[in-house]
A protein has these predicted regions:
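Internal alpha/beta scaffold segment
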Residues: 145-147, 152-213
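Noncatalytic scaffold domains of N-terminal-nucleophile
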Residues: 1-104, 110-158
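Conserved small/polar residues in nucleotide/adenosyl-binding loops
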Residues: 214-219
Length: 219
């Protein structure tokens, strides 16, 4: 597997679901008007906010990745280096996109000018997402995965996200081993947990796919 292609290239991107998911959650559970909810984010994106120490460290850590793309370099760099603590981060384009989402709901993102810009950027950089993919996207309510670990009841995300199933698998395997409670960060504990994680993630690539198109078998 080409790690860079799988994790950092345009081929690693799926259709973004956050906008549609948040809109559906608002329609079902929200009380405030949709536009009013987005207003503060538009203001912050347009006027900017001061970079915190934590964000500055994160930008510095990821500076090589951010420098690869002119779009991210333009936003997160100043005078040849990433923004520092106290610098102002302004995101005018984000403010424009948020305004469209505030006015039109999901259509402000998945259709029209935003969708066309996403498709154009994808085509320039070897990505696959098209305006058709975006306009056809729909979020879905799904039943969460529930499982027990010792005296805890854990509720987490179902497929098509792999996280919940993998988490459940790892906890099931943890039930079969003994960890040193007095030394949680001991080398032996870390080795056992890392081996469990490796096994779980290797199984993910074999058995998991989108549930709308694939039947998942229980093992």
């Amino acid at each position: 597997v080409n790690r860079e292609l799988a994790l950092e290239s345009y081929l690693s991107s799926g259709v973004p679901g956050t906008v549609y998911g948040l809109y559906m959650a608002h329609q079902k559970f929200g009380n405030l008007p949709w536009k009013k909810l987005i207003e503060p984010s538009i203001l912050i994106a347009e006027k900017g906010f001061k970079i915190t120490e934590t964000l500055a460290k994160s930008l510095e850590t990821n500076s090589l990745k951010l420098a690869k793309r002119s779009s991210t370099k333009e936003i997160f760099f100043k005078d040849g280096s990433t923004l520092k603590t106290g610098d102002l981060l302004v995101q005018k384009d984000l403010a424009k996109t948020l305004r469209l989402i505030a006015q039109k709901g999901p259509a402000g993102f998945y259709k029209g000018v935003t969708a066309r810009k996403i498709q154009s950027d994808m085509r320039k950089n070897g990505g696959l997402i098209s305006t058709r993919d975006l306009s056809n996207y729909k979020a879905k309510f799904r039943q969460p995965i529930k499982f027990n670990y010792k005296d805890l009841k854990i509720v987490t995300m179902p497929p098509p996200s792999s996280g919940g199933l993998i988490l459940g698998l790892m906890f099931n395997m943890l039930e079969e081993i003994t960890l040193d409670k007095n030394e949680p960060l001991s080398a032996d504990n870390i080795l056992k947990i890392s081996e469990i994680m490796q096994i779980a993630y290797s199984l993910r690539s074999v058995y998991l796919a989108a549930v709308s198109y694939t039947h998942l078998r229980a093992h």
